[in-house]
Every structure is written in structure tokens, then in C-alpha cells.
């Protein structure tokens, strides 16, 4: 049961359960933790009381503490012994029972926050109170709102850290990916103006890989996302506001990931759902796309497409669609990511 009420009591007070675990504090004090119902039942004589992630003001005028601490209910009694590996072994939330057995790690933070605080508020409106309000609002998102987002998705993951302007999450690789999309959407809606953005790195690791290395390597992916620059059709240049997906050379804008890569992955899954050549085709296609600059790659891809869709009623249409995606550099990058996502989703667990 979650402990969300923390009471500081005098050691000499006898009206609470002495067998209850406690933490000794200086000056003859002790810290006890309760769930809300048990606290109300016991009603200890307190010096001070704190509530975690609750707006409740009826518990002895408690001090509110906000903390991003979402932890999935894995229904595994040995979770404390197995650690994070439990999430790799869990079936992903949106792809039940399928996919590679891997951990996903998400690291993200707000872009250009120093500039926002320095010049984001017009000079004539700048004040200490407005700056403090901006800081508090961002902190509230990463300490309180983040829990609501992950609880709504029931994602198989755990927050390692979330506060200030950044976060670090570990869990089932697929759930981490979908959670990242939800977090970005929620942050955009929370800020309301599109000026504040986040960049992120998403890594995928074996369950036995050292957690410190996961953090470091995913941090490098986050740094790669911070370097993202794209020139738009109207001549404007967009920077950051991006995500590095598994590799530092696979950086996409959030819109590309959610509006191109993810829908394309689902389209690919639909196309190959009843195609026995599906998985083998995908592996070969990814290899050709990664080496598309080689002269022989384009003809080989055309041949592979023709053979793979042989017998399909809409063979010509499918071949044209895949070949057109491969012929454009940005579309090709999105296609590779979608194919990799699909392969990881259908690969045998192990």
C-alpha cells in the first residue's frame, strides 16, 4: 500500500503503534509513514505532518509535497528482488504479449530554459512573482502532472527522477516509447503556447545492462536530440523539440514520430499481418535502406518489393508506396524507424 502521509512525532508520545517502522530524527523526534486511511484511524499527536501528491488540506493542515513517483503495479511478488528486469518481462501495455524482451529508458528536459527565464517574459511585465510562477508551474508538471499521465496509460514503467525541468524513466521498452509521446503531448497542452518544448532520448537495453550505463547512453541520445535542426518549407529553422530513438543518428521531431513513424509502423503491421515473408522481408529491407547510397541498393530494393508482394491483389500499389518512401531521404529515415519498431514488436521474447 502506498504511504502518502508522513508524521513527525515526539518519541515520548504513546498514542501511536510502537511496532510501526519509524525513522529516528534529532531532538527526540521520529518520522512515521502512513497511508491516508490508517493515519486518520490512528490520529497520532504530531509535531508536523506532510502529505505526498495530495491536495488534501484536512489532515492537520498538512504541508504538501509533490513528487513524480509513478511505479507500475506489475502484480509480481518478487519485484523487489528482480528489480527493473520485471518491466522487460512484462507484456507491453499496448502490444499485449508481443515483442522483444528489453528495457526502455527515457531521459528528457525542457529546451532553452535559461533563455526562457532570461528573456521569455517581456521586460515591462517581468517580475519576481511571474518568474517564480513559471518555475512553480514547470515543477508542478514534472512532479505532479507526470503521475496522472502515466497512471492514465497504466504503463509498465517507473519514474526514477522527475522534477524541475527534466525526467528519467525506465520500464518496458514499448511502454516507454508510448509514454514519451503522451508526455510530450501533455506538456504542449500544459504550456499552451508551443514556445516551451522538450527534447528526449529513448534507449533500449538488455535487462542485465548496468543502470548507470543506461543512464549515460540515454543521456547521450538526449544530447543528440538537442542538436536537431530542420529547415521548414517556409524557410524558417526549427531546432531541438525532438527525440532520438535508440540511436544518435535517428533523431526526429516529435511531430514526425507521432504523425509519420508511429502510423507507418501500424500500417506496416497491417500489411504483413498475414504475409509469411513479413519478418524476413523487413530485415532485408532495413539493411538496404540503411545503405541506400550504394548504387546497387535501389535495384535490389525494387526486386525485393516485387518478390515480397507477389500474389497480393494490390502488389503494384504497395511496391510504389514503399519505393516512394525509400526514394526521399526524410521519408526513408521514418520508414527505417517504423520498420525497426515493427520488428521489435513482433520479435520473439528473449
Question: PLM features: residue spans?
Answer:
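Charged, helix-rich terminal subdomains or tails
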Residues: 1-350
Amino acid at each position: 500500500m502506498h504511504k502518502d502521509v508522513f508524521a513527525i512525532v515526539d518519541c515520548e508520545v504513546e498514542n501511536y503503534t510502537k511496532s510501526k517502522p519509524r525513522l529516528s530524527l534529532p531532538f527526540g523526534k521520529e518520522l512515521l509513514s502512513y497511508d491516508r486511511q490508517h493515519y486518520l484511524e490512528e490520529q497520532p499527536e504530531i509535531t508536523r505532518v506532510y502529505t505526498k501528491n495530495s491536495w488534501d488540506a484536512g489532515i492537520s493542515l498538512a504541508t504538501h509535497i509533490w513528487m513524480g513517483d509513478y511505479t507500475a503495479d506489475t502484480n509480481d511478488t518478487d519485484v523487489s528482488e528482480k528489480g527493473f528486469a520485471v518491466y522487460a518481462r512484462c507484456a507491453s501495455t499496448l502490444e499485449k504479449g508481443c515483442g522483444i524482451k528489453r528495457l526502455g529508458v527515457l531521459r528528457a528536459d525542457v529546451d532553452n530554459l535559461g533563455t526562457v527565464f532570461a528573456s521569455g517574459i517581456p521586460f515591462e511585465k517581468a517580475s519576481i512573482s511571474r518568474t517564480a510562477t513559471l518555475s512553480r508551474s514547470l515543477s508542478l508538471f514534472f512532479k505532479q502532472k507526470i503521475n496522472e499521465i502515466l497512471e492514465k496509460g497504466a504503463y509498465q514503467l517507473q519514474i526514477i527522477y522527475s522534477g524541475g525541468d527534466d525526467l528519467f524513466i525506465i520500464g518496458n521498452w514499448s511502454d516507454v516509447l508510448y509514454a514519451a509521446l503522451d508526455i510530450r503531448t501533455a506538456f504542449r497542452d500544459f504550456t499552451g503556447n508551443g514556445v516551451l518544448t522538450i527534447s528526449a532520448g529513448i534507449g533500449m537495453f538488455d535487462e542485465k545492462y548496468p543502470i548507470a550505463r543506461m543512464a549515460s547512453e540515454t543521456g547521450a541520445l538526449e544530447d543528440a536530440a538537442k542538436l536537431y535542426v530542420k529547415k521548414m518549407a517556409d524557410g524558417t529553422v526549427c531546432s531541438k523539440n525532438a527525440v532520438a530513438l535508440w540511436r544518435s543518428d535517428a533523431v526526429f521531431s516529435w511531430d514526425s514520430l507521432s504523425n509519420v513513424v508511429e502510423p507507418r509502423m501500424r500500417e506496416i503491421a497491417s500489411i504483413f499481418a498475414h504475409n509469411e515473408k513479413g519478418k524476413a522481408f523487413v530485415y532485408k529491407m532495413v539493411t538496404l535502406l540503411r545503405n541506400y547510397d550504394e548504387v546497387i541498393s535501389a535495384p535490389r530494393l525494387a526486386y525485393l518489393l516485387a518478390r515480397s508482394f507477389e500474389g497480393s491483389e494490390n502488389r503494384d500499389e504497395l511496391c510504389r508506396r514503399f519505393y516512394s518512401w525509400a526514394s526521399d531521404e526524410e521519408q526513408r529515415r521514418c520508414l527505417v524507424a517504423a520498420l525497426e519498431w515493427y520488428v521489435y514488436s513482433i520479435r520473439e521474447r528473449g
